[in-house]
Amino acid sequence: MLISFAWTTPQFLDGSKTATRRDWSDLTFKQWCKAWDEGRLTHDGWDKNPRCKGKKVGRFMLTARPYRERLGDFPESDLAAEGGLWPTVQDYINLQGGDQDKVLVVIRFRKLTEDSPIE
């Protein structure tokens, strides 16, 4: 499985991005939860969607089971984990349409390097 980090490729590559929120279908959410439950924790990071001529730029390992979170519950501490592109939580919420009740899937991970231990 893969995730595209189109807006935050540099932050993914330098390891500072450790969380991403996605507006995924129930099916996609369940697939990621199943991967966690089955111990399939390593996945590919891409610079953009492969259908848009993206390329694989690295690998990452899930560090928590994917979960859903209301945008209004977005912790300020996650601004840096999301790549640091948004100065405030409200800026991030506005990017997502401004609805604090919108629910997104949260994926927490760490970027793997060639010598990263996979636990």
Regions found by a protein language model. Give the residues of each.
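Structured alpha/beta reader/binder surfaces that contact nucleic acids or chromatin modification marks
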Residues: 1-119
